[in-house]
Amino acid sequence: MIPWLGPEPVFPPVSQALSHPNGLLAAGGDLSSRRILTAYSEGIFPWFSDGEPILWWSPAPRMVMFPDELKVSRSLAKTLRNLDYEIRVDSAFPEVMRACAEPRAGQDGTWIVPEMVAAYCRLHQIGYAHSFETWIDGELAGGLYGVSIGRMFYGESMFSRRRDASKLAFVHMVRHLQAQGVTMIDCQMHTEHLASLGARLISRDVFLATLKENVRHPQPDRMWDYHYRHESS
């Protein structure tokens, strides 16, 4: 059994999260900005499907990206050099979320339900949720979004409409956040896609200790002022 959350944004200790399913900690509550930010600051995130109650997770081990461990394959490096593209931040946040929510091959549905879209758009409006976007030929070709607290970034989801478009946004995000003093990016759960870019699993204790250190630091001024245009020679 897992606890059902009350009206206050208070969570049980993450040490109480289940092993099966990995990381399930609590259910219920709401998707208010206050509750979501409290959750992220404690290493917890919401993840549920349409028709389910709100479920809160803190898996162990945890998938993270340390920016200095970013891997860029030869083919991706070639794309970075030879493709005409533009990277923008926060120019189309709702569109990025809706694109991430679109059904994908082999999946019956999406966890980015309308309530989640509304909740994260509210976080974006108050400066806590951000998108990194790849634009090609004037069109949104791929990107990702996540939540930022202090010098901690929590990646949520990504999408591609063109080959490698989400990877382009990811590489620029990692390099930019590293320049801003971010030392760890939360990727939540293991995927081969993220592992190919250098993300890896770490223990819950290491994750929480690093998170605690990062969230207490104020963000640098103009942290989200980023724009890059690449034209192949």
UniProtKB/Swiss-Prot annotation:
EC number of the protein: 2.3.2.6
Organism: Chromobacterium violaceum (strain ATCC 12472 / DSM 30191 / JCM 1249 / CCUG 213 / NBRC 12614 / NCIMB 9131 / NCTC 9757 / MK)
Keyword hit for Disulfide bond: no
Annotated Gene Ontology cellular component terms: cytoplasm
Gene field: aat
Protein name (Swiss-Prot/TrEMBL): Leucyl/phenylalanyl-tRNA--protein transferase
NCBIfam families tied to this protein: aat
Domain of life: Bacteria
Catalytic activity: N-terminal L-lysyl-[protein] + L-leucyl-tRNA(Leu) = N-terminal L-leucyl-L-lysyl-[protein] + tRNA(Leu) + H(+); N-terminal L-arginyl-[protein] + L-leucyl-tRNA(Leu) = N-terminal L-leucyl-L-arginyl-[protein] + tRNA(Leu) + H(+); L-phenylalanyl-tRNA(Phe) + an N-terminal L-alpha-aminoacyl-[protein] = an N-terminal L-phenylalanyl-L-alpha-aminoacyl-[protein] + tRNA(Phe)
